[in-house]
Amino acid sequence: MTKNWKVSSQDVFSQGPVVPVLVIKDVKHAVPLAKALIAGGIRVLEVTLRTEAALDVIKAIATEVPDAIIGAGTVTNAKQLAEVEAAGAMFAISPGMTSDLLDAGNKGGIALIPGISSISELMRGIDFGYTHFKFFPAEASGGVKAIKAIGGPFPDIAFCPTGGISPTNYLEYLSLPNVRCAGGSWLAPDDAVEAGDWDRITELAKQAVAGAAGI
């Protein structure tokens, strides 16, 4: 199926290598946080729908930070997919998948990256025409060994593992041929965001990018 996505899931994955998973409670933090991450070399940003401010945060970044590739996380149904697209998201990431969500993603205007944690779920997503997936929760679902094993029968499928990813293990994931990027929350610690310590966040981003460049 040909999808009418403005930005493909392949484009999103290739702009990695690290995707910060952002839980932003106050919209006033949205723009400076996005700019701090971009200053550190990270353009792909995932704003999770875990706070009441999430849609406003996405809208603010989409409007005021044109260099950002802004997406929404924790998208679990077709209604939310439509809402984040209307807010300006360029892609949506789900922790799982349903038939309704996969169908809505195929018909929508932004890239949908479904979540899987098993081969059966992966095969279901492939049946709907998807090739790029979130592997979640990564560490709890077998981690590096699990993704490596999945790559055997499905060598053309790409993953972005999220869940338990940290500065101490993200390079292990990125070294796998079927992993294009990794998602993590360590790039924007709550205390740094609340304090407006944007220099610290920029430095964390620079460190993550530099580490990945060595692979």
Swiss-Prot record:
Keyword GTP-binding: no
Pfam families the UniProt entry points to: Aldolase
Site (Plays a major role in determining the stereoselectivity): T162
Broad enzyme group: lyase
Annotated metabolic or biological route of this protein: Carbohydrate acid metabolism; 2-dehydro-3-deoxy-D-gluconate degradation; D-glyceraldehyde 3-phosphate and pyruvate from 2-dehydro-3-deoxy-D-gluconate: step 2/2
Binding site residues for pyruvate: R50, T74, K134
Keywords: Carbohydrate metabolism, Lyase, Schiff base
Summary of the function given for this chain in its UniProt record: Involved in the degradation of glucose via the Entner-Doudoroff pathway. Catalyzes the reversible, stereospecific retro-aldol cleavage of 2-keto-3-deoxy-6-phosphogluconate (KDPG) to pyruvate and D-glyceraldehyde-3-phosphate. Involved in the degradation of 3,6-anhydro-L-galactose (L-AnG), which is the major monomeric sugar of red macroalgae. The cleavage of KDPG to glyceraldehyde 3-phosphate and pyruvate is the sixth step of this pathway.
Subunit structure: Homotrimer.
Protein name: 2-dehydro-3-deoxy-phosphogluconate aldolase
Provenance organism: Pseudoalteromonas atlantica (strain T6c / ATCC BAA-1087)
